[in-house]
């Protein structure tokens, strides 16, 4: 299948995509976990009783990774194949997740692929992404042709989504601050319309995973057992369920309260960078960790309206899609090519 624009938000927590299917926007999401593929899957011998996991083998640099919604969130030794480092976009895991998103969508040719990076790493790594993923790619399932790659700051995707779907809440004449609480980083952009204020925008490695690690450490201290599968803590908090740990249901709310200092530290850094907020029409809160940070952000900016995006996980990807379509249309117009 050929598409004009394919938008991918390869986050530290989940990989999200958006692309056009007729007049609709198709979206998909799976965990940003890329374990080495298992060659002897027992479920294939289950005679229809055992369900096979929804994963694809994705080849990168001679290794095969399992990618998809059915990927295991925990492993026997606590390493599920998730990468939490600032140079994540340089890794084979990142390439495998990007390849998986293209394969699950059934895409074989893309005129423009739009990718995002955290605000504080975009200058460092955007050229690498353009060079690495423009041209003919192959992840073990045939060639995929990518004609061009555009890299944008991740929160810009949410700002564009807010402008498109926020109705009258988006004020083009005044400034908004977009806060994107991701899995590993929290990024914020102050923009007047679509003009970014670099001096007031920034990012910090203080996303949701740091909170989950704190909770894991507190549980380990109480239970006197190591706790390393923070993905299960993430899932339980999202679903508002207790964590099963050696037959015991552990309520995570008190542990979340004890981890509040980590959230407050990130929000304080944000306050220091942004400065006075009298000129802001609103703060737009997005990202998979938005719910964790919302109370602290309301407390830190009590006089500014807070808009929490619906389906915040997909906000960046949908915004990337709009950015890709707009830039492609402008370039075609400049060349005198029909859109």
What is each PLM-predicted segment?
Residues 213-224:
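Long, charge-rich alpha-helical interaction segments
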Residues 188-193:
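PRPP/pyrophosphate-binding module of the type I phosphoribosyltransferase fold
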Residues 181-187:
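Ser/Thr-glycine-rich phosphate-binding loops at phosphate-binding pockets of nucleotides
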Residues 1-176, 195-209, 222, 231-284, ...:
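Nucleotide/phosphate-binding catalytic cleft detector across ATP-hydrolyzing
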């Amino acid at each position: 299948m050929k598409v004009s624009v394919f938008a991918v938000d390869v986050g530290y927590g989940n990989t999200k995509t958006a692309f056009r299917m007729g007049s609709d926007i198709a979206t998909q999401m799976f965990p940003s976990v890329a374990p080495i593929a298992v060659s002897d899957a027992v479920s294939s011998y289950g005679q229809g009783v055992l369900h096979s996991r929804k994963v694809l083998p994705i080849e990168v640099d001679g290794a095969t990774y399992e990618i998809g919604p059915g990927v295991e969130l925990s492993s026997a030794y606590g390493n599920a194949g998730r990468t939490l480092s600032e140079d994540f976009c340089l890794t084979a895991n990142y390439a495998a997740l990007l390849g998986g998103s293209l394969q699950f969508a059934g895409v074989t040719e893309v005129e423009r692929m739009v990718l995002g990076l955290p605000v504080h790493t975009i200058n460092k790594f955007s050229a690498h992404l353009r060079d690495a993923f423009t041209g003919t790619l192959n992840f073990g399932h045939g060639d995929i042709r990518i004609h061009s790659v555009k890299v944008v700051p991740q929160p810009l995707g949410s700002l564009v989504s807010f402008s498109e779907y926020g109705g009258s809440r988006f004020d083009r004449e005044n400034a908004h601050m977009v806060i994107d609480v991701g899995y590993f980083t929290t990024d914020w952009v102050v923009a007047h319309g679509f003009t970014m204020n670099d001096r007031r925008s920034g990012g910090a490695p203080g996303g949701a995973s740091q909170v989950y690690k704190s909770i894991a450490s507190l549980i380990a201290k109480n239970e006197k057992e190591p706790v390393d599968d923070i993905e299960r803590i993430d899932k339980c908090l999202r679903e508002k369920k207790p964590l099963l740990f050696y037959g015991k249901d552990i309520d995570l709310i008190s542990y979340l309260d004890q981890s509040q200092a980590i959230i407050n530290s990130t929000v304080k850094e944000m306050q220091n960078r942004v400065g006075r907020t009298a000129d802001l029409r609103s703060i737009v809160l997005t990202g998979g960790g938005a719910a964790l940070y919302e109370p602290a952000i309301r407390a830190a900016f009590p006089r500014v309206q807070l808009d929490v995006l619906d389906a915040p996980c997909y906000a960046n990807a949908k915004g990337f899609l709009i950015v890709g379509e707009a830039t492609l249309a402008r370039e075609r117009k400049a060349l005198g090519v029909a859109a």
